[in-house]
Structures are given as C-alpha cells and as structure tokens.
C-alpha cells in the first residue's frame, strides 16, 4: 500500500476472482449473504457500468475496492510464517460486517485495518509481520508489538486500551494503533477543489476525537502501559 496509488476499473473488475482464489487456497468459504460477497457484486461488471453508477454505488464500489485490495496486496507480501495469522484475518472479514457505520462487537473492518497497517509499515521499510497481538516489528533490541484496535464505540476506548495493554504486556513492549474511522464526521464524499483541505479537515476531525481522551492516554503512557498511540482516519474525497 503506497501513496497515490491509481487503480483502473479493469483492475477492480478482476479483484473478486483474485480474492476467491485466495480464499480457496486457505480453504475458506465465502457465504452468498456475507458483506464480502456484496463487495464482489459491487466490483463485477464495473467496466460496463462505470458511466452510469450513482453516487451511492460509487461509494459502495470504493469501499469494496479497499477491502478486496487490502486482502490481495497483503497476500502478496506475507511469508509462510504469517499464513496462519492471515487466514484468521480473512476469516474475520468474511464472517463479520464490513459496513463503516454499523459497529459490531468484533468488526470485520478491524481485520481490514490490520491488513492495511502492516502494508503501511512495510512500505516504510519497517520489518513488520503479522503476529500476536496483531503485528510484530523486528528491531535491534528484540520484537516490538503492535495492538490494532478499531474504535466501534467511543464509550469503549478505555476498554480497548486496557485490552491492548494486556496484550502488549504479555509480550514485552509496543504501541497501540487506533482506527477512528467508524466515527468519521463526513458521510458520503468530501468535495473540494484543494486536496490540502481534505488533509486539514481530517486532522481537525482526528484531533477533536482525540482531545476528550487526551488525559486518559497521557496517564496510560506515563504508567508505561505502552510506548505510544497512532491514529488512523480517512475519507472519500472528490
């Protein structure tokens, strides 16, 4: 997952078949009523439909593209050692909701977040691999552990951080990667003539989400529960 990636409609139309082959290789069934299967439907035949897509259909297409691309790209970089963890993640994606505004107890989007985050790290030449609790980074001083948490409810931030603390403490040192996307303030598409406006709006959005809990984060950091926090947030823009 690199910056400024351009994906053609031709590539998107091939995504469902590629993902089906990956699931078959790992002996995983894709149910016809799953959100993952709906991602396939959004991408199939898109070359012939692209000029007649409504805005809601375009949004569904982009969300489907993101899920399928995360699976395909992560599959292309995993090692033999990571196959078991990868199999678990794609099983979660198939079994759970992928709707951004439909939080669940164990959301499939958190598995997508993990697949995206490890690609983000490897793109930046970090020696990262899928492993407990979610991602393991190889460093000169030993393994460094990352706990990935999608915040489905703002009421559960403390619980998620406490769980991450336990997971990291069992293994040594690490940090928490938080995904705040379920609480994005922009429904639909952010429209602007200046790309920088999107970045500034997202920065304000992330800061407003972080600020009310800053004291709690600081207390946990001061207690040595983990070494830091990263926050992911993004939106569709035109």
Kindly give the residue locations of the regions a language model identified:
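Charged, structured surface patches that assemble and position nucleic-acid processing machinery
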Residues: 1-106, 110-115, 119-123, 158-238
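A short acidic/basic microdomain associated with nuclease active sites
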Residues: 118-141
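Short, solvent-exposed loop/turn segments at secondary-structure junctions
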Residues: 128, 151, 183
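Short His-Asn-centered micro-motif
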Residues: 131-132, 148, 178-180
């Amino acid at each position: 997952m690199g910056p400024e990636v351009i994906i053609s409609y031709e590539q998107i139309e091939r995504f469902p078949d590629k993902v089906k082959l990956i699931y078959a290789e790992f002996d995983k069934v894709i149910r016809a009523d799953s959100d993952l299967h709906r991602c396939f439907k959004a991408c199939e035949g898109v070359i012939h439909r692209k000029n007649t897509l409504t805005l809601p259909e375009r949004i569904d297409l982009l969300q489907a593209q993101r899920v399928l691309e995360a699976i395909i790209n992560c599959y292309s970089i995993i090692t033999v050692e990571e196959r078991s963890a990868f199999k678990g993640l794609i099983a979660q994606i198939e079994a759970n909701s992928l709707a951004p505004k439909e939080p669940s107890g164990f959301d499939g989007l958190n598995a997508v977040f993990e697949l995206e985050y490890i690609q983000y790290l490897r793109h930046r030449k970090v020696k990262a691999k899928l492993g407990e609790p979610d991602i393991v980074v190889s460093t000169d001083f030993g393994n460094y552990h990352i706990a990935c948490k999608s915040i489905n409810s703002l009421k559960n931030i403390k619980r998620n951080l406490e769980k991450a603390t336990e997971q990291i403490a069992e293994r040594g040192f690490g940090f928490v990667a938080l995904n705040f996307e379920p609480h994005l303030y922009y429904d639909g598409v952010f429209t602007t003539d200046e790309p920088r406006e999107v970045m500034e709006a997202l920065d304000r959005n992330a800061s407003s989400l972080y600020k009310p809990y800053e004291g709690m984060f600081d207390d946990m950091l001061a207690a040595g529960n983990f070494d830091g926090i990263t926050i992911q947030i993004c939106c569709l823009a035109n």
